[in-house]
A protein has these predicted regions:
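C-terminal, surface-exposed recognition/capping segments
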Residues: 62-204
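GGW-centered surface loops in extracellular recognition modules
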Residues: 1-41
Length: 204
């Protein structure tokens, strides 16, 4: 969202700057690809909607209050989740099987004409959160609470409280939303959000 305007990118919580993308002709504007197509630009390598549910349900989240740094500033708090390869091994599945269907065998990357609002069943929380860095941290990825940039203002919000991450799957029933995942101290959440907001890309 701030490519080419890094010098004005907000780096403190609740900081605002107007140099965010506002119109679709801006190269930084979100990709308007419609479901069931998948992301083809910056989010193309992010997990799909099915994989996010595997992270949510079998990632054994650990909240870690440790300090991390970004853009020359220090912040604290983030969530450890098991790597997808570890989840696949634990569940006796292949990575391709995790990509092809969520737990319960629904494939949220496909259209279901008889259930156009299937995304309503997608929204879920995991509140079974352990405290502290996992001892076998090499089996996990760390998601910092970087917050997100709010459309309409360019405001950096929820820094140090939430971390928002995009999937590679647009949400059906219109083209504005995509499936996402967020973390905070007491939960991991999967759902969907407005693509005009700027979320983080998946670190794995």
């Amino acid at each position: 969202a701030w490519k080419g305007f890094e010098s004005s990118q907000p780096i403190l919580n609740d900081e605002i700057d107007s140099n965010y993308p506002k119109i679709s002709s801006d190269a930084r504007w979100y990709n308007p690809v419609m479901h069931p197509a998948t992301a083809s630009r910056s989010a193309k390598d992010c997990p799909n909607a099915n994989e996010f549910l595997w992270y949510l349900m079998y990632g054994e989240p650990h909240w870690d209050p440790s300090i991390w740094s970004i853009m020359k500033h220090l912040y604290d708090g983030g969530m450890w989740l098991k790597k997808l390869s570890v989840i696949a091994k634990d569940q006796h599945k292949t990575l391709q099987e995790l990509k092809a269907a969520a737990p319960g065998e629904t494939d949220y990357t496909k259209n279901y004409p008889s259930a156009p609002k299937i995304y309503e069943a997608y929204v879920k929380d995991n509140t079974n959160i352990k405290l502290g860095k996992p001892t076998n941290s090499s089996d996990y990825i760390f998601l910092p609470t970087f917050g997100y940039y709010l459309a309409g203002t360019g405001k950096l919000t929820f820094l140090g409280r939430y971390g928002y991450y995009w999937s590679s799957t647009p949400r059906p029933d219109g083209g504005l939303n995509a499936y996402n995942l967020y973390i905070r101290r007491d939960k991991v959440h999967v759902g969907y959000g407005d693509r005009t907001n700027a979320h983080c890309l998946w670190p794995e």
